[in-house]
Amino acid sequence: MKYLTGAAVLAASTLLLMSCCDKQSEPAYIGPSDIRIENGKMTPEVLLSLGRLSDPQLSPDGQFILYGVSYTSIAENRSCRNLFLCKADGSDKVQLTQSGKSISNGRWSADGKTIWYLRGGQVYKAPFKAGKLGKAVKMTDVPSGIGEFSLSPDNAQMLYVSTVPGPVKHPSDFDPALDKAKAYVAEDLMYRHWDHWMEELPQTFLASTGNGLITPDKSLNLLGEDAGRFELPLEPYGGLEQTSWSPDGTRIAYSCKKLAGKEYAFSTDTNIYIYDIPTGNTYLVPSGSGYDTDPVWSPDGSKLAWLSMARNGYEADQVRLMVASVSPATENEGVLSITDIRHLSAQLDANVEGPVWDADGQRIWFSALVDGLKGVFSITPEGVVTRLTPEDAWFDFGSPFGIREDGTLLSSFCSMEFPTELVAIRPDGSFSQLTHENEHILSQLTPYKTEKRFVNTVDGKDMLTWVLFPPEFDPSVQYPAIEILLGGPQGALSQGWSYRWNYRLMAAQGYVVVLPNRRGTTAFGQEWCEQISGDYPGLNMQDYLSAAQMIKAEPYIGKLAACGASYGGYSVYYLAGVHGNTYDCFIAHAGIFDEEYLYYETEEMWFPNWDNGGLQEYAYTPGQMGPAGDGITFGGMKQAGSPWSNLPKPQRHYANSPAANVTAWHTPILCIHGMMDFRIPYDQGMAAFNTAQMMGVPSKLVVFPEENHWILKPQNALFWHRTYFDWLDKWCKS
């Protein structure tokens, strides 16, 4: 690949930086790593040195791809993202920016002559010509900062995400003189979410780009009279993919969960709305009572597609592709007409991701996990589904971000061998890698082998299990093994790449890595996925033991460890009390130890209420206060999955919590947790460690005070990996 660097690019980058910020406050630039690898061995340091490619955008003329790459400095304990460009065939890569502060959200102008981007919480634009950026102009001045933005098709308007005060209060809200007092005050549920207290709510604002510097007083909150009451976009992961501009720029479709407090905590009822800019009216798109997200307009604006789950309270329900016809208000006496709502993907027993309309509006492209691999599919208006990418291609493909004139799709892909790169997928399903961001590093590594196996379960089903072998594997030599216990519990072990649970890294340390897609995984149809709900101590645990039995039968396997995060951590704590002598050591990250206590302290209550055995037994009566006296309802919420439920599945669930079997613990265990984890609070990890100590079990506790459910800061991540492998080596290699 040709790299266009040198004086011209650096001069343009310097000009850009001088126009954006005070040079004295500019942190050091972080660029690609020049790491040299000894003996071809992958290490945690190698993993963290890789560039992370994201957010590709095809230019309006189809000639260029704009994308971002983040590089990490372990010494500075941070990452920095800059913008890059290549031709649509992957050639002539050029670095557009060289900033010490991250630049993200790069977007083309409608004529392709300007690039807009986000830096330091504000939006800028710079002219683009001959592969270079000119002097940048600041477009926004929003004191609360901007997290993301999108432009209308004609660039005359902008949507941006910022924040307003949330439901959690501080002492100074009651008495301004107490400006140094620190406390959080809540009067309803959902007072914290994922890793933060709800001091602020994300809101989406609409503003004109042709009226000078965009400021809050020139912006319209898209929620109108509901401003400050609800989230838009949905926390904690949502962004502006939950909004969509109509092709003529007169309507905005968006996804919003218009609930708060207890109602929010127990419900997944998120709906699609259409905001009509000329009239200021908002219209509800009728759909189910579960998650409805990610709306996408057809090229002519006559149809709207979106993703939908049918059942309220079930966040792992099948993700369906819905479509509706939308007629302009001008054709219906000033009222927007939404008709012909259809479930388009009924023939597909899989979750739809990232729908993208074809240019002619006659099909929709999307990605989906099917039979353990994520592929690219198309669907017609009649609901006929066709897989484009080969069934035997061991990659995970993302949804297309662009389509060339010859019908070639531009997308991303990854595998267990390499992180995300850009790829071109031709109409016949063949594909070519476009970018090679980390080739200079990965080419130094010794190759390894992966096998696809099917394990027979206790009830006679075939379970897809990936097995990775160490580089230069010799079957006459004995190796320790790691069995990965999946989190979720709904998720999949496919060909994804992770910067924490990296299976290539594990194999490189001399381990055989076993990845069983046990009950509850999402790449094998909804029946396989749903079986786990209400059956945590059941068949999926037997699936793990079946996979362990399979690998231990191999003559080249010595000791076996079981490791997992989140539900995988729950699985570790549960198996610790029932496995007998199957495993030689355990590692649990952010695991559930006491299911009953977790119900009292987690934040998204719909999840345990459903998955702990309540299933569809959810109801809310507005205005109802206090216990209803039926042993299930509390505070107006019917909680059939609660510890006080009288249904058999929840009673079995809590009776078999990992904490119930601690007297049988005898296997060395490492417990890791982040203190900012509000999904599974860190006292769960402390309780597991304390228990192991009291049982006389060799154990270790690692708590990261600044991390959430994930470990994100570079030095913390490095320490996490070192601790992980030190523990495995101590108990499995000795």
Question: Predicted regions: what is each one?
Answer:
Residues 17-20:
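C-terminal motif of bacterial Sec signal peptides marking the signal peptidase cleavage site
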Residues 50-65, 100-116, 143-158, 191-204, ...:
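Conserved beta-propeller blade repeats
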Residues 437-559, 565-566, 600, 604:
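Cap/lid segment of the alpha/beta-hydrolase catalytic domain
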Residues 55-57, 159-161, 184-185, 190-203, ...:
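Non-catalytic accessory segments flanking enzyme active sites
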Residues 26-30, 80-81, 163-214, 218-225, ...:
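Predominantly five- to eight-bladed beta-propeller fold
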Residues 75-81, 118, 196-200, 263-270, ...:
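Short, solvent-exposed loop/turn segments at conserved positions within beta-propeller repeat blades
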Residues 87-91, 127-132, 209-213, 276-280, ...:
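Short loop/turn segments that connect beta-strands within beta-propeller blades
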Residues 515-734:
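Active-site-proximal cap/loop segments of hydrolase catalytic domains
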